From Swiss-Prot:
Pfam family, one: Prot_inhib_II
UniProt-listed InterPro entries: Prot_inh_I20, Protease_inhibitor_I20
Start-end of each Sequence repeat: 31-87, 88-147
Superkingdom, natural source: Eukaryota
Reactive bond for trypsin, annotated site positions: 93-94
Protein known as: Proteinase inhibitor type-2 P303.51
Site (Reactive bond for chymotrypsin): 36-37
Length: 154
């Protein structure tokens, strides 16, 4: 009888461990299946946090990206950007001396992606805007960005 209980316990333990391995593997699988052909994109814009109180950026509220907030060197809120990357406003190129840095919903990675390589709308990152070689807006990316250092070195 004791052997039967030990076998049941080991079998139960193996099932639980197997389910844990399966669930952890599923977390790393991108649910979006994209085709393998390359897109014909010219460049991409990904609004990102930029600058710091010590390393100021040169922009103004008109030219700043919608969804990004702009701050002074002492951290006071100045404005939210007014320019939509899909339809940029005609804005002056002057630097607002009050703006030191920006905070955007996404802060990792490059702001300008050029060239885009083999990126398509499907493989492009959410929150990034992709344009054709003629400069016209094509699409917003559809895939989640990979988390930085997802598999750290051991």
């Amino acid at each position: 009888m004791a052997v039967h209980k030990e076998v049941n316990f080991v079998a139960y333990l193996l099932i639980v461990l197997g389910l844990l391995v399966l669930v952890s593997a599923m977390e790393h699988v991108d649910a979006k299946a994209c085709t393998l052909e390359c897109g014909n994109l010219g460049f991409g814009i990904c609004p990102r946090s930029e600058g710091s109180p010590e390393n100021r950026i040169c922009t103004n509220c008109c030219a700043g990206y919608k969804g990004c907030n702009y701050y002074s060197a002492n951290g006071a809120f100045i404005c939210e950007g007014e320019s939509d990357p899909k339809k940029p406003k005609a804005c002056p190129r002057n630097c607002d001396p009050h703006i030191a840095y920006s905070k955007c919903p996404r802060s990792e990675g490059k702001s300008l992606i050029y060239p885009t390589g083999c990126t398509t709308c499907c493989t492009g990152y959410k929150g990034c805007y992709y344009f054709g070689k003629n400069g016209k807006f094509v699409c917003e990316g559809e895939s989640d960005e990979p988390k930085a250092n997802m598999y750290p070195a051991m």
